[in-house]
Amino acid sequence: MILREWRRFYTIGSVLLRHGLDELIPRHWQPWPVRLFRRSLFWLRNRYPEQSRGARLRHAFEGLGPVFIKFGQMLSTRRDLLPPDLAEELAMLQDRVPSFDGQLAREQIEQALGQPIEALFADFDQQPLASASVAQVHTARLKENNAEIVIKVIRPDIKPVINDDIRLMRLCAKIVAFLIPNNRLRPVEVIEEYRRTLLDELNLMSEAANAIQLRRNFENSSHLYVPLVYSDYCRESVLVMERIYGIPVSDRAALEANGTDLKLLAERGVEVFFTQVFRDSFFHADMHPGNVFVSYEHPHDPQWIGIDCGIVGTLNRQDKRYLAENFLAFFNRDYRKVAELHVQSGWVPPDTKVEEFESALRTVLEPIFAKPLAEISFGQVLLNLFNTARRFNMHVQPQLVLLQKTLLYIEGLGRHLYPQLDLWQTAKPFLEHWMRQQIGPKAAWRAIKEKAPFWAEKLPDMPDLIYDTLTQVQHQQHMVKGLYQQYHQQHRRHAQARFLLGAGATLLLGSILLLPTHEQLASAGLTISIICWLNGWWKISRR
């Protein structure tokens, strides 16, 4: 690492330690070299012992800047990984950053589109309409048709900042994974998922494609409106779309003043969500209040407006089927069915004891269902399910995590608009109708017709496919032997690395103690400790 990265690495470590976040790792999970090294950093003590661990984690991420703020926001949706108190605190993170100079935005747009602003747009406002950590938004008009538009532009020089922080986060994740084997949090995988999410946000062509798809799915719909994307003007760092005017969905007073039917609006939000999931298999996965507006027009026939389609979710047919059956089984209190569906779908390991899983579900969910249905939080049911399934080693399902987050948003918005909203009564007819379409002779015949061309094409090739499969099995047996040898080599390297890290920490502590009386000996010890640490880290990072 270069000097700049070492400084940033120290800053990250010192902020985390000053907020006492080393306490998040149980002492019995900390190898003795780590405990020894932590004691040597005696000047970095927890300065906020009176705060909860969730508050300390949130404040630490806020202090580390936009990359860590967005990481915390992503972690807040991973209820399958984090304890509830941490997830709820991280959900409070706000993506508030100062805007950058409008002249820089102008130059960025001109560079991306290859023409001066004046040749394409009129009334370009250099004062941003909105600003976030990755991009900011300016208003203008299209010269070709005088349409009002917004231009979203990526922050200049944001990519090197993101790459540096992600590289350091990946290094920290590798160290955590090495020091705490079999960690359910899977830190390296989490950082990799975050990297992909950030890269998607940096490519505005991806957001444009998502918005176009969502708009097509709800074309001529009275329930949801998605602004028009001007794709000819879109580039990787620039997105141009129709400017919309609406009432923020969180501004209930303004909605009431406009005469909006809040009950119908809340119910339509639920219908829009389930339509996206079960009809289209493609849903807007970032419907927090800042991304949702309500049309001023036709307040007695209200229409939602969705913006910022940077994050979307998709579900395959099998996931939709299991999800719908799970929802119906939940509210019929058929916990056995829920447990069996989780095993059949592969969401929990196949050796899970269904009886134990059923009993755990009943213990957690039965008190919830003792309430009237109108008072039950659909999202809370999913949260309790995830927390229970986590104890049974539920495999992470990114699409379900996004769906659960979106459902929490929709339910929260719906109950804010109309506190008596019975989400189950609104959703149940939709789910039952969808299930009827998926089960029965008509559904079976439809599936056969869909698959018939595929099997007709593959049938003549079946002998060759069987032979190729048997050959691959034999080849994979040889690969397994090779992987077994690699595992033993890696295990040996990790054992050596543990020794080097422990020796380095011990020498460092000894050098600090010897420094006042034996400066030369302390310098030698410090040099050797650095060599040990570098060698140990090198062994950790080797594949």
Swiss-Prot record:
Active site positions: 286
Pathway listed: Cofactor biosynthesis; ubiquinone biosynthesis [regulation]
Enzyme class: transferase
MF terms in GO: ATP binding; protein kinase activity
Enzyme Commission designation: 2.7.-.-
Protein topology in the membrane: Multi-pass membrane protein
Ranges for domain Protein kinase: 123-500
Record's keyword terms, sorted: ATP-binding, Cell inner membrane, Cell membrane, Kinase, Membrane, Nucleotide-binding, Transferase, Transmembrane, Transmembrane helix, Ubiquinone biosynthesis
Subcellular location: Cell inner membrane
Record InterPro entries: ABC1_dom (IPR004147), Kinase-like_dom_sf (IPR011009), UbiB (IPR010232), UbiB_bact (IPR045308), UbiB_kinase (IPR050154)
Keyword Cell inner membrane attached: yes
CDD domains: UbiB
Transmembrane segments: 499-519, 521-541
GO-annotated cellular components: plasma membrane
One GO process term, biological-process aspect: regulation of ubiquinone biosynthetic process
Ligand binding (ATP): 129-137, 152
Its job: Is probably a protein kinase regulator of UbiI activity which is involved in aerobic coenzyme Q (ubiquinone) biosynthesis.
Family according to the record: Belongs to the ABC1 family. UbiB subfamily.
Annotated protein name in UniProt: Probable protein kinase UbiB
GN (gene name): ubiB
